[in-house]
Amino acid sequence: MGVTPIKSVAEYKEKVTDATGPVVVDFHATWCGPCKAIAPALEKLSETHTGIQFYKVDVDELSEVAASNGVSAMPTFHFYKGGERNEEVKGANPAAIQAGVKAILE
């Protein structure tokens, strides 16, 4: 399935806040080393958990989305279920990301 980039505020609203199913959002930056390091693991998760929509938001391109979500460190992962944020993970922590995925599937 893969991790799909979100390119606009309207697209973020449509695909994340208006979503009815589980969603994972990776807030990242192109210059962020840990973001690049965790990207393959996130791709793998997206292929394993096909019932979850995986998106990524470049904080430099969509700074207003990052700010409105309280993102202050990269990478930050938000886990949504039914349009509500359930979990947040700051940093490239594979175990915590797995736990966030599990939480939105329950």
From Swiss-Prot:
Active-site residues, as the UniProt record annotates them: C32 (nucleophile), C35 (nucleophile)
Coiled-coil parts of chain: none
Primary gene name: TRXA
Site (Contributes to redox potential value): G33, P34
Keyword Ubl conjugation: no
Keyword set, alphabetical order: Disulfide bond, Electron transport, Redox-active center, Transport
GO molecular function: protein-disulfide reductase activity
Name of the protein in its database record: Thioredoxin
Similarity-based family: Belongs to the thioredoxin family.
SS bond partners: C32-C35
